Amino acid sequence: MEINVLKNYEELSSTVADIVETQIKEHPLSKLGLPTGDTPLGMYDELVKRELDWSLVITFNLDVYLMNIDHPESYQSYMRKNLFDKTNIYPDHSHFPFRPTSAFEDKIDGSMGIDLCMLGIGTNGHIAFNEPGSSFESRTRVVDLDEQTIKDNSRFFDSVDDVPKQAITMGLGTIMESEKIVLMANGVNKLNILNVAMNGEVTEDIPASILQNHDNVEVYYCD
């Protein structure tokens, strides 16, 4: 699988924002899978600047921490701050994983699936919060976070002890049913795992490696 190497973070953000913009303009009723974290921040900033019409778009976030949704580091707060409060998307059109998790799957199915799913990748190869060892057939569920993920995400909290230990994540099987997937990665610390995931063995030990089996995946990287 080809990895598109871009010259800097600004180009990465602009390029993936172009993909989302095209999707929304050509298909106003689009269903999008949306990520959180550091990497997509530039993409969201670009999308806000472009003043797109989000009124018919439906979004499904990939994952959420099991924590108070009003906490400043909750992914609900993240999305409101970086995208939802700055666009005309209807609140009823933005969905986060919830319990019972089967009901979240039903919402995706009821919307006829995800058209475009945007992903990041963790240093251990996770996508969404599908940690190493996750079944390729997995659906939305509650998961325990890997020690590496907790350590990596501690930079967002006062201490590693404050990082939630559980999350609800869209499953690998759910993600793979998306019509198109775009994976973005930023930083030299992601290059090795990206190469392993995209060009190595397809194994549940590297959850992102399942993307090799999808027929419409684009990968973008900058250091």
Map each language-model feature to its residues.
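N-terminal glycine-/serine-/threonine-rich phosphate-binding loop
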Residues: M1-L32, S94-H95
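Glycine-rich N-terminal segment of FAD-binding domains in flavoprotein oxidoreductases
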Residues: E26-R50
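Glycine-rich beta-strand-to-loop/alpha-helix junction loops that act as flexible
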Residues: L34-T39, L119-T123, N186
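A glycine- and small-aliphatic-rich helix-loop capping segment at beta-alpha/alpha-beta transitions
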Residues: D45-W54, P132-R141, G200-V202
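Ligand-binding beta-strand-loop-alpha-helix segment within the catalytic cores
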Residues: W54-M118
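Glycine-rich phosphate-binding loop
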Residues: M112-E137
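Class I SAM-dependent methyltransferase SAM-binding "motif I" and its flanking Rossmann-like core
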Residues: A128-L172
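ATP/nucleoside-binding phosphotransfer catalytic cores, i.e., glycine-rich phosphate-binding loops
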Residues: G171-G173, E177-D223
